[in-house]
UniProtKB/Swiss-Prot annotation:
Documented EC number(s): 4.1.1.37
Protein name from the UniProt record: Uroporphyrinogen decarboxylase
Lineage: Bacteria, Pseudomonadati, Pseudomonadota, Betaproteobacteria, Rhodocyclales
Alphabetical list of Pfam families matching this protein: URO-D
Highest taxon in the source lineage: Bacteria
Coiled coil feature spans: none
Cellular localization per UniProt: Cytoplasm
Subunit structure: Homodimer.
Length: 358
């Protein structure tokens, strides 16, 4: 594989000095880009897009052609793993992802098994390999998965939920069943991410999108414990290079110190926590990724730039910061505002370093 021309993102994750703050965006290949919408139309469906290595590669590269981003992220979906477990993923118009066979009885749960990433999920590995070849060493490629808890939410609820009634009922009435789901799912996530690393992913991220809906004791028992299990099982080095890991719990700022202790290289922050305070708490242990409110991208360009500078100023000219949004970019984002954001992050972070001689 080609040597990286821009490894700023990887160095930042390892808290090494960088010339500027690297930036990429969660969901950077998505519906806010007209070229993505055109490719999605050609694919016929979102799942077809995910399951075609050539089309997944095409949309992964689209934001990199527009913006000076410092990393690419595999185009896929967090629900590929439970789909490979046989739950039957489909997308209902106006409802988002659904499962034909959600986990509702003990027999189904006890028979849950880890899918082979080189069988049911080989299309993902083929996409990773194809994207790495297409990037030709320009920037690193991030692989990803949902967290065990977040995947379990979809697997038990059958789709998105407002109150998580089914899975929370299980957590408090039959925790043994939920722990079984989480254990199998954690092992599946480890195998899935390691297969992505072997296929060419140079960093990996675990999205714990729904960890923040839990009470503290429940978060530690049903989410954090299994995030730890995933991190412990990851491949740490590949092709002679460290493969950094990022863990992101949306709504997890109140547990930041505990999350930082599980062994990942970086912790993602949503927009509700001051990143300067976060650095003061855990900056000696982990890099931090974040944490602009995605809604700021609806504002005029000068407001976008001002808020980006505010986040950078809060973190300061220290190593270990990867700039990102606090959650995925909205489909309604004006594409030109992303240009403003990326350019501001690069320019202002260089000025911050120059001011201290860094």
């Amino acid at each position: 594989m080609s040597r990286l021309k821009n490894d700023t993102f990887l160095r930042a994750l390892l808290r090494q000095p960088t010339e500027y703050t690297p930036v990429w965006l969660m969901r950077q290949a998505g519906r806010y880009l007209p070229e993505y919408c055109e490719t999605r139309k050609r694919a016929g469906s979102f799942l077809n897009l995910c399951k075609s290595p050539a089309l997944a590669c095409e949309v992964t590269l689209q934001p990199l052609a527009r913006y000076d981003l410092d990393a690419a992220i595999l185009f896929s979906d967090i629900l590929t793993v439970p789909d490979a477990m046989g739950l039957g993923l489909y997308f209902a118009e106006g409802e988002g992802p659904r499962f034909e066979r959600p986990l509702r009885d003990e027999w189904e749960i006890r028979n849950l098994s880890v899918p082979d990433p080189h069988a049911e999920l080989q299309y993902v590995m083929d996409a990773v390999s194809e994207i790495r070849r297409a990037l030709d060493g320009s920037v690193p490629l991030i692989g990803f998965s949902g967290s065990p808890w977040t995947l379990a939410c979809y697997m038990v609820e059958g789709g998105s939920s407002d109150d998580y009634r089914r899975i929370k009922t299980m957590a408090y009435s039959r925790p043994d069943l939920l722990h079984h789901i989480l254990g199998v799912t954690a092992d599946a996530v480890v195998q899935y991410l390691n297969a992505q690393i072997e296929a060419g992913a140079q960093a990996v991220m675990v999205f714990d999108s729904w960890g923040g809906v839990l009470a503290e004791a429940a978060y530690r028992e049903f989410s954090l414990r299994y995030l730890q299990r995933v991190v412990d099982g990851l491949i740490r080095e590949r092709e002679g290079q460290r493969v950094p890991s990022i863990v992101f719990t949306k709504g997890g700022g109140i547990w930041l110190e505990s999350i930082a202790a599980i062994g990942s290289d970086a912790v993602g922050l949503d927009w509700t926590m001051d990143i300067g305070r976060a650095r003061a708490l855990v900056g000696q242990r982990v890099a931090l990724q974040g944490n602009l409110d995605p809604s700021i991208l609806f504002a005029p360009p000068e407001a976008v730039a001002a808020e980006a500078r505010r986040v950078l100023d809060a973190y300061g000219p220290h190593p270990g910061h990867v700039f990102n949004l606090g959650h995925g970019i909205s489909q309604f984002t004006p594409p030109e505002n992303v240009s403003v954001l990326v350019d501001t992050v690069h320019d202002h972070s260089r000025k911050l370093r120059a001011a201290v001689g860094g």
